[in-house]
């Protein structure tokens, strides 16, 4: 009887856990869908920024901007990294992969400055004595363009003050629902050739804007304004991709956990039925034995 009760208690515990994992899967699926819609809504705006920058570069050629100039006079350049991790676990290998990738990137640098988003990464890097910028504390849940603007206003101000010389962002790039990999992008200083490549500009590129587009007060001023918006757009995109990757990883992990719970329940149900049959057989045998003894 004790064995049967143990199986029943274990089955009850697994059913309760299954309810939790299934609920987490559904929540992650809803968040994933919402994040994708956010990115789709913002895409036309950033596409317009991109096309306008490309048009100015095509018409004006070379543009002078402080975010394009490498600080060559410095031999020992200070590097900074924006690292996007999750707020919590239960997301498969999502956090482990991005932290491991970040540590590999940091091996070649001397005391890099880290802007860590997400409690998992923040706690890890603080625990391991990395140079984490303490005033940078932003949630990664439900990323918004307003948050990306606020983040980059702080970081661009530090770059202008020469607190660091180069800036990179490390995030999880979502190639598809089944393929997600940690990635790194150099944000500052911008490289004109790389930017032209991202803006899809080459020698045969035609004018993106038809007719004679005029920029007030001048193309260079407009370009300088758009550069900051472009950088913020890249950061926003990285936050949304990381968030969708995290939710997708959690949804997959919870789906697997729910499936494993179902498998365990099937096995335990079989064990329970066998134990119950064995108990009934034992009871019948004892009754028959008792009846025979009374004859």
From Swiss-Prot:
Source taxon at top rank: Bacteria
Keyword tags? ATP synthesis, Cell membrane, CF(1), Hydrogen ion transport, Ion transport, Membrane, Transport
| Primary localization class, coarse | membrane
**Parts forming coiled coils:** none
Places the protein is found:
Cell membrane
One of the entry's Gene Ontology molecular-function terms is: proton-transporting ATP synthase activity, rotational mechanism
The UniProt entry, under InterPro entries, shows: ATP_synth_F1_ATPase_gsu, ATP_synth_F1_gsu
Q: How does it sit in the membrane?
A: Peripheral membrane protein
Entry annotated with the keyword Membrane: yes
**Which Gene Ontology terms describe the biological processes this protein takes part in?**
proton motive force-driven plasma membrane ATP synthesis
Quote the function comment for this protein: Produces ATP from ADP in the presence of a proton gradient across the membrane. The gamma chain is believed to be important in regulating ATPase activity and the flow of protons through the CF(0) complex.
The family classification in the record reads: Belongs to the ATPase gamma chain family.
Quaternary structure, from the entry: F-type ATPases have 2 components, CF(1) - the catalytic core - and CF(0) - the membrane proton channel. CF(1) has five subunits: alpha(3), beta(3), gamma(1), delta(1), epsilon(1). CF(0) has three main subunits: a, b and c.
Q: Which PANTHER family match?
A: ATP SYNTHASE GAMMA CHAIN (PTHR11693), ATP SYNTHASE SUBUNIT GAMMA, MITOCHONDRIAL (PTHR11693:SF22)
User: By what name is this protein known?
Assistant: ATP synthase gamma chain
Identify the species of origin.
Acetivibrio thermocellus (strain ATCC 27405 / DSM 1237 / JCM 9322 / NBRC 103400 / NCIMB 10682 / NRRL B-4536 / VPI 7372)
């Amino acid at each position: 009887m004790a064995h049967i009760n143990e199986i029943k208690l274990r089955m009850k515990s697994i059913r309760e856990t299954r309810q939790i994992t299934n609920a987490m899967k559904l929540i992650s699926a809803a968040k994933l869908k919402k994040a994708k819609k956010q990115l789709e809504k913002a895409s036309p705006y950033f596409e317009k920024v991109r096309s306008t920058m490309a048009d100015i570069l095509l018409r004006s050629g070379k543009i002078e901007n402080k975010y394009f100039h490498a600080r060559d006079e410095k031999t020992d350049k200070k590097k900074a990294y924006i690292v996007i991790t999750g707020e919590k676990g239960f997301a498969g290998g999502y956090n482990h992969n991005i932290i491991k990738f970040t540590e590999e990137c940091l091996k070649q640098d001397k005391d890099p400055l880290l802007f860590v988003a997400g409690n998992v990464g923040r706690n890890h890097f603080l625990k391991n004595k990395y140079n984490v910028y303490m005033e940078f504390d932003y949630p990664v849940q439900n990323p918004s363009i307003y948050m990306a603007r606020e983040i980059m206003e702080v970081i661009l101000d530090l770059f202008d003050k020469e607190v660091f010389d180069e800036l990179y962002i490390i995030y999880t790039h979502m190639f598809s629902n089944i393929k997600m990999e940690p990635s790194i992008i150099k944000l500052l200083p911008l490289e004109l050739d790389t930017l032209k490549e991202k803006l899809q500009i080459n020698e045969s590129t035609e004018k993106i804007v038809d007719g004679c587009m005029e920029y007030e007060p001048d193309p260079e001023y407009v370009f300088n304004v758009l550069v900051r918006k472009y950088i913020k757009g890249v950061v926003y995109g990285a936050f949304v991709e990381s968030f969708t990757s995290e939710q997708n990883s959690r949804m997959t992990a919870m789906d697997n956990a729910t499936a494993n719970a179902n498998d365990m329940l099937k096995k335990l149900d079989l064990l329970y039925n066998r134990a119950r049959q064995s108990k009934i057989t034992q009871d019948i045998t004892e009754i028959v034995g008792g009846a025979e003894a009374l004859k």
